[in-house]
Amino acid sequence: MSWDDEAINGSMGNDDAVLMDSWDAEIGDDEPVMQSWDAEEEEKKPAPKPKKEQPKKVKKGKESSADRALLDIDTLDEKTRKELIKKAEMESDLNNAADLFAGLGVAEEHPRARALQKEQEEQALKRPAFTKDTPIETHPLFNAETKREYQDLRKALTAAITPMNKKSPLNYSSSLAIDLIRDVAKPMSIESIRQTVATLNVLIKDKEREERQARLARVRGGTATGGAGKKKVKGKTNLGGAFKKDQDFDLDGPDDFEFGDDDFM
């Protein structure tokens, strides 16, 4: 007799009945058994397609900075555009070099700062553009305090002013030099003014001598000490004292050497 027949005929004990009940309960809780193995499997539902991200709409009048820069550079001429591109490439190279130096631990100055410093030095070496409104007293030479500094100022002023005489001697003397000497001498003491006058008198004598020598050099036969065109006096012939003026014969005077007829006898 099999184990199933005992369960049907009731010959199974209580313990065995309880075991059967629990086994049936476990079977009942399982999923239902398919009636046919040939049943087709349910078609799997297709996975939902991912939604495409829609580009964000940009409000009118609010363009991105890159688009705005692109539009600005497109409006420039070819030369300016090339200069801007070259400048941008240079800045990019400098930044890359700075990052490389920083990664290598090289403690050096930033290339951009070095380039800026070099540009500033070149600008400082360039000659400043002075205008008529530029105050001349702002020049460092006018901060003179020592004797040497005053001499340097005098030499600089002399070198800058005296060439103007070639442009217009009349205006140089009447409108500049004479009035300038007077104005400069005003704050001076009387003794200092006298020294200035004495210096000018010496200058006058030197100029007179130079003009006289130049005039005599232009005249043929002139001398530096004599007058212009003065003829030279020829010297007398030296006879060695044989004849003197007081020993000349007087033909009109009495005849001291009269000879009588008897002298030739």
Swiss-Prot record:
Residues 23-32, 249-265 have a biased composition (Acidic residues). PANTHER family: EUKARYOTIC TRANSLATION INITIATION FACTOR 3 SUBUNIT J (PTHR21681:SF0). Disulfide bonds: none annotated. Present with 17900 molecules/cell in log phase SD medium. It comes from the Eukaryota. The modification Phosphoserine is found at S65, S92. Residues 1-71, 219-265 are annotated as: Disordered. The modification Phosphothreonine is found at T75. GO terms for molecular function: translation initiation factor activity. It is found in: Cytoplasm. Pfam families: eIF3_subunit. Belongs to the eIF-3 subunit J family. Keywords: Cytoplasm, Initiation factor, Methylation, Phosphoprotein, Protein biosynthesis. Component of the eukaryotic translation initiation factor 3 (eIF-3) complex, which is involved in protein synthesis of a specialized repertoire of mRNAs and, together with other initiation factors, stimulates binding of mRNA and methionyl-tRNAi to the 40S ribosome. The eIF-3 complex specifically targets and initiates translation of a subset of mRNAs involved in cell proliferation. One of its GO terms (cellular component) is eukaryotic 43S preinitiation complex. One of its GO terms (biological process) is cytoplasmic translation. The keyword Phosphoprotein applies. The lineage of its organism: Eukaryota, Fungi, Dikarya, Ascomycota, Saccharomycotina. InterPro entries: eIF3-like_dom_sf, eIF3j. Residues 42-71 have a biased composition (Basic and acidic residues). Its main location: cytoplasm. This is Eukaryotic translation initiation factor 3 subunit J. Disruption phenotype: Marked reduction in binding of the eIF-3 core complex to 40S ribosomes. The keyword Protein biosynthesis applies.
